[in-house]
Amino acid sequence: MTFGGLDLFMTQKTCNFGFVKIDLIMPLNLNIVEQSIVPPFRQIINQIEESIRNGSLKSGEMLPSMSEMAESLGLSKETVKKSYLILRDQGVINSTRGVGYFIASPDSNRKKRVMLLFDRLSIVKEVIFDSFASTIGEQAEINIYLHNQQVELLDYYVRKYLDSYDWFVITPHFPLDSKTQRQVLTILRRIPIRKLIILDHKLDNLVGNYGTVYQDYATDAALGLSMAAEELRPLRKLNVIISQSSLYHAYACQSISDFCKANKISCVFHSNVSPRIVHAGEVYLIVNGQLDMDLINLVRAARAKNLKPGKDFRIIAYNDSPIREIVLDGLTTISTDFEQMGRLAAEMILDNTPRKVKCDFRMIRRGTF
């Protein structure tokens, strides 16, 4: 249902106010949808920004006065004022006393404002951030926030900062139950599609031309292991260390099980490492996020049995990071390319070309395999 509409053409005239040249012809067609989840002030902002992008509005063209806009759209003057002030603060429009608001000249020196909303800090997130920041350079101001996999925090940050940033880059890692996922989608839909980039996890139920750079938890583990299928088949067993509390436990286990079944490899899943599961001639894939503790327990148990990693038994870790190049003379990993993830997200912002890209996933061979 359309609540109000504005189709306004002002008299053609060019005026000079100091250094400001203003063209008083301004074709503008706005429609406010009453039942939209997007509030009216945000609808005004979105439509003016879209008119600038598609060339309907150009630098120097006047906007209607607040009173004219409010009357034509059937809104309060305060609603229109809120839209104009936000657009002015963002550098989209300017104002001159006694004249009104007009479309600002493009400011090539203005830095883009980017919110990085991660679930938690980790070595992997640091790799993503470093790559993102080095690619985007001095062209953006970046602020990091954490939602800690809590929907309430996601909602809080989106509500509070929706009008403060040009781009929102979000890792949507939340519990996978249907209720939580519906809440997440509802919150994310408040963000204008053109400002949104989803990282690390693809949201199939979120439609639109937003950007996403993701890994596929349902297939990637099998893809990585397939790169060493010939070496894995002769070994006695693949031991997978993965906690049942892991967010994507079911996806990873299914992917690994499918690989082992297809390649006739014996596979056993464990929630942690104990000395009784450590044997010569076997492989240990550590999927748990707390790699350090599992790795320490595995190496301790192996040393007690005079077993050397890479020689008497093999170790593969899930997810790569710089420290894994050094541990045990190099820890073999299967991993998404997190540097690529950060770089591609930054390039989407720099080029203003959101798209959907699956990151490369590979095995990085080092000393433990």
Show the residue positions of the predicted features.
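An alpha-beta-alpha
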Residues: D220-K261, V357-F369
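N-terminal helix-turn-helix
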Residues: K58-S95
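Periplasmic-binding protein-like
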Residues: M115-L116, Y165-L176, I197, L238-S243, ...
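Hydrophobic alpha-helical segments within soluble ligand-binding/sensing domains
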Residues: D200-N239, D294, N319, I334-P354
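Amphipathic helical "hinge" segments at domain boundaries
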Residues: R42, M66, D89, Y101, ...
